[in-house]
Amino acid sequence: MTGFFTFLSFSLAALSVTNAAHILSVPKGAEVVPNGYIVVMKDDTSQQDFSSHRVWISSIHHNKTRRGLDGAGVKQTYDFDHLRGYSGIFDEDTIKDISNDPKVAFVEPDAIISQHVVVQQRKAPWGLSRLSNRRGGRNYVFDSSAGSGVWAYVVDSGVDIRHSEFQGRAVWGSNLVDNKNSDGTGHGTHVAGTIAGKTYGIAKKAKVVAVKVLNSEGKGPTSGIIAGINWSIRHARKHGMLHKSVLNMSLGGTYSAGLNHATAQAIKAGMFVSVSAGNDNINSNGNSPASERSVCTIAASTENDGKASFSNWGPAVDLYAPGHNILSARPGGGSQTMSGTSMAAPHAAGVAAYLIAKEGIPGNRACLRLKQLSQPTIRNPGPDTTSRLLYNGSGR
């Protein structure tokens, strides 16, 4: 490997409130009932106030019907001990009126709920099959939700968003390092493919957001990395996705209090953050952002459940994940094999996205969930280092 400048990618081969009116959002692309909404009243709404509110809504619907305007009105009413509300079909003006009532807690689109089935991918890349089988195996076993409705921010060298692996689920977010909206090293595309690719990915239905902070040499200033984190938080917040987002940084350098602090803010905001431990076979406590205690710091394992010879170690490491000879997407189409803790971290990001979709956990609780599901199988993990290997909880 070449020497570090400020930053090097760690590779060994080349629903929230969206406005003051309390209208909640659903992930873009989610299937919803056309013009269908669910309205929930505040906890302290009395039965009398709720009845008055429903009379008011009925009058609005009646007036619109008299004027020949479309709108089916209230379809179902909910009146439980601690939940009063209703659902129905309403136009935009009516929803604005409803959301401005001080007795209303929130309004949300009426999303479609589907059955979940188990899918098995045969002859999968070894990293995928390993994380879904406690004792190893050749198949990748996963729930069909597969990260649906979750966004993955890839803070890296860029992503080939047109690659067929992403099936139109990848978008360009921001470029904070140069004026080339492309992946000059192939690193970011490979990482994104592991997180959300249709063949090589874990969360096969997640959306990828490319945040470029590394140049064509795989380097970038710490200030640019911090800017990338800041942009990602603001973007996720704007779209109501903070608790349904994962952020992966397969990069690192010398210790930086500023970078660690910025990384911690993403987690406090509600996101899951995975970072690579580093490739120097040293204690990762001296590196950033790997040394930030609140992130999920990932070391690299081999096909035989051993510590990869290059992988950093130490108490900052939260989990091991596959990081040796990992096959994933390459810019321009096709695939390539890479090794490094850069390849391990996106496995964790992918499983986090998968669990956020499958179990409904918030992003900033996902690292704890990953550790709860993990298996103590890594041989010779290093001094003061966990032996726990990433697992998706498939039951196999």
From Swiss-Prot:
Membership in a protein family: Belongs to the peptidase S8 family.
Keyword Hydrolase: yes
Alphabetical list of Pfam families matching this protein: Inhibitor_I9, Peptidase_S8
Domain of life: Eukaryota
Region (Disordered): 376-396
Gene Ontology CC, one term: extracellular region
Location of this chain's protein in the cell: Secreted
Matches recorded under Gene3D superfamilies: Peptidase S8 propeptide/proteinase inhibitor I9 (3.30.70.80), Peptidase S8/S53 domain (3.40.50.200)
Function according to Swiss-Prot or TrEMBL: Secreted subtilisin-like serine protease with keratinolytic activity that contributes to pathogenicity.
Endpoints of the signal sequence: 1-20
Principal location: secreted
Biological process terms in GO annotation: proteolysis
Annotated PANTHER family: CEREVISIN-RELATED (PTHR43806:SF11), PEPTIDASE S8 (PTHR43806)
Prodomain residues: 21-116
GO molecular function: serine-type endopeptidase activity
Organism this protein belongs to: Trichophyton equinum (Horse ringworm fungus)
Record's keyword terms, sorted: Glycoprotein, Hydrolase, Protease, Secreted, Serine protease, Signal, Virulence, Zymogen
PROSITE patterns: SUBTILASE (PS51892), SUBTILASE_ASP (PS00136), SUBTILASE_HIS (PS00137), SUBTILASE_SER (PS00138)
Polar residues compositional bias, start-end: 376-389
EC category: hydrolase
Peptidase S8 domain mapped to chain residues: 125-396
UniProt domain Inhibitor I9: residue ranges: 37-113
Protein name, as recorded: Subtilisin-like protease 5
